[in-house]
Design a protein with these regions (language model features):
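Short, well-ordered loop/turn sites that connect or cap secondary structure elements
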Residues: 103, 109-110, 129
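Ferredoxin-like alpha/beta domains used as RNA- or RNAP-binding modules
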Residues: 1-97, 124-170
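Short glycine/serine/threonine-biased micro-segments
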Residues: 96, 111, 117
Length: 170
């Protein structure tokens, strides 16, 4: 499936984001884009926020639109439901657990098949994790330097629980 391969700092500069949100510890030397201080219309503000959400979560337009359509069909506040759907993506959960430094790295760890959900290997980054699912690192992948390095640097959010010894999460 397609994904955005545009340079991270360039895109952050365009959207006015801090690269540290994405786990990138670099800064752009060029500052903001020209005309960054101009007043945006309401539509421009909405579009910019949508583009930020798409970029941060690494989702393409068509997939984002499908999630939006599903959120509008469900009962509740559409924006909150959309963010819940984005947060429950497998690659995002791996990032939140601290098994990777960035969402892009989490996507790669998932696509290379280093993880299991409920004992079954899942290599689809957009898989929506359900409440009660058990995520584990495969036996062959427990010695990966990337995973060991990332575990020591992150704190896990309250809606997830992580066992560092067994390398499993709920």
């Amino acid at each position: 499936m397609a994904r955005d391969r545009q340079p991270v700092l360039k895109k952050c500069r365009t959207l006015g984001l801090d690269p540290s949100i994405l786990g990138v510890n670099k800064k752009s030397k060029r500052g903001l884009r020209p005309n960054a201080n101009r007043k945006l219309t309401d539509y421009g503000i909405q579009l910019r926020e949508k583009q930020k959400a798409r970029f941060v979560y690494g989702v393409m337009e068509k997939q984002f639109y499908k999630l939006y359509e599903e959120a509008t069909r469900k009962d509740g506040v559409t924006g909150e439901l959309l963010l819940q759907f984005l947060e429950r993506r497998f690659d995002n959960v791996i990032y939140r657990l601290g098994l990777s430094n960035t969402r892009r790295q989490a996507r790669q760890i998932v696509s290379h098949g280093h993880l299991e959900i409920n004992g079954r290997r899942v290599n689809i980054a957009s898989y929506r994790v359900k409440q009660g699912d058990v995520i584990t690192v495969r036996e062959k992948s427990k010695d990966l330097a990337i995973i060991k390095e990332a575990i020591n640097q992150k704190s896990v959010p309250g809606w997830l629980s992580f066992d560092e010894n067994a390398l499993s999460a709920k």
